Amino acid sequence: KQETAETTNVTQGQDVGVPNPYEIVDTLEEASKIAGFNLSVPATYGDYKKQVIQAIEDDMIEVIYFNDTDNEGLRIRKAIGTDDISGDYNEYKDVETVKVGDVEVTEKGSDGDIAVVIWNDGTYSYAIDAGEAKLNSEAIANLIANIK
């Protein structure tokens, strides 16, 4: 009987849920005030012309790009520290570290499509997660050059 009671308590505890740490804002300037650092990213990416900008206090800024039918193209993240902040824990067939300009990045994907790119500059971590957008090495290089 004691085991049953513990199981019930755990289930009830999980139903409460964790509050979403992200605060949705209108501009990168607002996001930088929340996160405590700046992020600059391209205004659009291909057909993905709508942005949702969100921030976690003293931690992270995330920009999600959507197309006209609200399909997610990709998301770009920047956070304090040097950890992998992609949020993507899938196993990929292709994982390689490449040099893009002066930056060493790790690209993960399969069959020529890059799904995740992560890098850090010693102070901040960055991540690009592809949704429906197709990313190749050239697209990644252009994005990285425009993410600060």
For the regions a protein language model found, what residue spans apply to each?
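Gram-positive cell-envelope targeting signals
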Residues: K1-T7
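Surface-exposed amphipathic alpha-helical segments
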Residues: G122, A127-K148
